[in-house]
């Protein structure tokens, strides 16, 4: 798995779910 994806995906989840 691309480590960049692992770094960016949580940020999108945070923004979408508003749970940071």
Curated annotation (Swiss-Prot):
Intracellular or extracellular location(s): Secreted
Query: Which residues pair up as cystines?
Result: 14-20
Keyword rRNA-binding applies: no
Q: What does the record give as the function of this protein?
A: Antibacterial activity against representative Gram-negative and Gram-positive bacteria and exhibits a very high hemolytic activity.
Q: In which tissues is it expressed?
A: Expressed by the skin glands.
Q: Which GO terms describe its biological process?
A: defense response to bacterium; killing of cells of another organism
Sorted alphabetically, the Gene Ontology cellular component annotations on this record are: extracellular region
Q: Which family does it belong to?
A: Belongs to the frog skin active peptide (FSAP) family. Brevinin subfamily.
- Taxonomically, the superkingdom here is Eukaryota
Q: Which residues form a coiled coil?
A: none
Q: What InterPro entries does this protein's entry cite? A: Antimicrobial_frog_1
**Keyword annotations from UniProtKB, A to Z:** Amphibian defense peptide, Antibiotic, Antimicrobial, Cytolysis, Disulfide bond, Hemolysis, Secreted
Its name, as the record gives it, is Brevinin-1T
Pfam families recorded = Antimicrobial_1
